[in-house]
Amino acid sequence: IPHLCHSGKKGYRSDGNCRACMVEIDGERTLAASCIRTPTPDMVVKTESHRAKSARKMVMELLVTDQPSNEKAHDKSSHLWDMANLEDVSESRFPELEIERIPLLDDSHVAMNVNLDACIQCNLCVRACREVQVNDVIGLAGRGHDAKIVFDMDDPMGESSCVACGECVQACPTGALMPASNVDASQIGDSMDFDREVKSVCPFCGVGCQISLKIKDDKVKWVDGIDGPANENRLCVKGRFGFDYIDHDHRLTKPLIRRDGAPKGLNVNPEDPSSHFREASWEEALTFAANGLRGRGREVAGFGSAKCTNEEAYLFQKFIRQGFGHNNVDHCTRLCHASSVAALMENVGSAAVTATFNEIENSDVAIVIGANPTENHPVAATYFKQFSKRGGKLIVMDPRGQALKRHSSHMLQFRPGADVSMLNAIMHV
């Protein structure tokens, strides 16, 4: 059965507004949209009756009418064209939309392009923005034939309050919303135009979102979220669009050694580092670095980064301890989490979390303190915002007026440094 407005992914409710999934039910006069019809005992559903098949084909023909042709489609492999091919529909006998009514390209956003000439108003992007990511940017404005998808108060996407999570792009079944990296100057693209797919974990924060990297000519062309336990297909702006640095011109691809007499500092032109550095072989560079570090002992200390993998962190501390012969090695996470680790060990017997953040679905009340998830862990924040949207009591405690307060039932904006006394007071209520 063809379907367009129905996603099937977690967080997306069925809407039944595209009417592409019509079926016939015995004893009922009208056809029913199968995605929103709940089955009942002894119900007889006919999916292949002449009436149901004719209705579905008619719907697909109507939807294709206002679409760019498949050769000029913004996404030649879109779900819409897959469903049209399923119904053996390649063109329409109905009159096309008047040229003056065709929506213009909106390329105001650096990461996404909006071509509403391909929009079928399935509202998947609206649900993606308002119900899954809970950013409340995309809406439907106008009535009847003038209805259209808008951003905020009908602003260009790049000037709206869009946070560029890209959920709408991944949800769109027609190519009306596409990654800017996946369409050419004529706005023609293909979501299957990649050589291979690599599944991985987003490297930016600790949420652990699972991602699918689409590789073309050994370069990342675009990224989709996949159904991992931490993200359930969702991504944030960094996870979806923050991979252009991999092929950036400023990345070093060859070892460099500072020229004799070149001043040390940050005033190096990244476009032309040759004024301060010269190219070298790996053997020369590693020998140069080893000679510079040899015999330094306690002059050198190590400070690890939270962006390193566990394996890299292990090798780094081993390098300091065995290479320099001392234990002057630390990690940035210890400084900010030492107190919480001690408290967790004392109270629950483990320094690790005892539940994932999406377990908030099973709670009535949730408190967020010492964190700014909308900025630092946006995918985790979507679960908190959904929790509040469903009627849960979300209490935010922070001296800053962070964005999550818009979704909270209570915002305790205490004075900086007063958190310990505030929590002690709460424990004695």
Task: Label the model's feature ranges.
Residues I1-P41, S54-A55:
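N-terminal cofactor/phosphate-binding cores enriched in small/glycine residues
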Residues E24-G27, M43-H428:
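N-terminal export/assembly segments and adjacent metallocofactor-ligating motifs
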